[in-house]
């Protein structure tokens, strides 16, 4: 599929080549859908063809295409790290973070920023192409207060990314706990901003406490007519409340993993990197999509025994006047 150095390039799929157009703002919307297909044992599946996939946009079937080549375009990455609440105790587990960042980005032009957050986000290192500056910023992190304003931090990072050159693709590497504590930004506001700026969020979360883990599964098995009739935005809000870091990753086509030790961190990053460069990049072009959040579903009707992990939604903005 792709070499390791192309891993993050595949994740950062939302902008068009060389920034030629804003794919979500344009009337002719190109939606790219990174898709991982696995067996029940977790082994990646290759050799599928476009006709094997069925993509729906708000329930309407769309013609699917398979993007064979992904150019190595420049990457803008915001590394967003929680330092509030109990997060700073996880610092020793993140010793391999700088190496992981370099491995994911690979041999392409890059611009990396470091943002720390507790009850509010703080820019530790502005966008730079120097790996040493990023390393020094990561080493300088200090324990924060009792907040964990994940939504505020993602909104802040997305704003910073929106100011980068248009030819740069955009991504957030979010390292945090699973639940938001203390954000002022509304979920809908963050969802719209992430969608409109074509930013993919890649979440690596501390394992939650037993109480949080129990709470996070409440409501997941809802039955009855209301379970499948909720609008995409209402379903998204519910997901964000259960597990903020997972919801925002799934929303944007990124991936969510959890860890509770340095070994777990290294192992999960290795698994995630393997997933990234083994993904299919599907695309479809809906005619004149209605403004707002659209739900995406990817299926393999002839291969019901396979597991499909794909982007779940995109945001279509109103056309300019």
Regions found by a protein language model. Give the residues of each.
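Hydrophobic transmembrane signal anchors and adjacent membrane-proximal interface regions, especially
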Residues: 10-12, 32
